[in-house]
Amino acid sequence: LVPAFLHLLIYVGFLVINLEVLEFVLDGILGTHRLFAPLLGGLYTVAINVFEFLAVAVLVSCVAFLVRRNVMKVERFTKPELKGWAALDANLILVIEIILMFAILTMNATDQILAGRGDAHYLVLGPLFFSSLLQPLFEGLSSGTLVAVERFAWWFHIAGILAFAVYVTYSKHLHIFLAFPNTWYSNLKPKGEMP
């Protein structure tokens, strides 16, 4: 039951966080920053907090899965068919997901420090709970360094998603992409039904 719930958190997290990724991509194409903020007003801060909550949920779920696979040694993961490439593949995907979630939180933390310093490019959004916990790590940095960290986190997340999208097609997680078309095109008629 616990693994199913953790998988659900990861799945829902990635579906919903893709709305924020859409904004990342549009900001990159249009040369804007936080494109949806003026459109959503106060709801934007709520949305970003929801995205951050889901990012932390994904992060915690991935850490739990790493612990199950590598520390607890759950019996089904010790079988020969799940050793070698299968184990490495699963661990790579979990680590990549953790890093991508940290990139979102780092971007938001540095973004809000810059906004608080009055940088014209950055919008003060209101309190962002989870990224505010990371802000003390970055507050001593100069504004130029913060911009570099924020931009690196943004680019890393975009490049990471694109690389992940390619990698997944070669991994055991291809079902993530195929689930929707497989469900959409599935035959709903009972097997063996007479025409």
Predicted features, each with a name:
Residues 1-195:
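Membrane-embedded alpha-helical bundles of multi-pass integral membrane proteins
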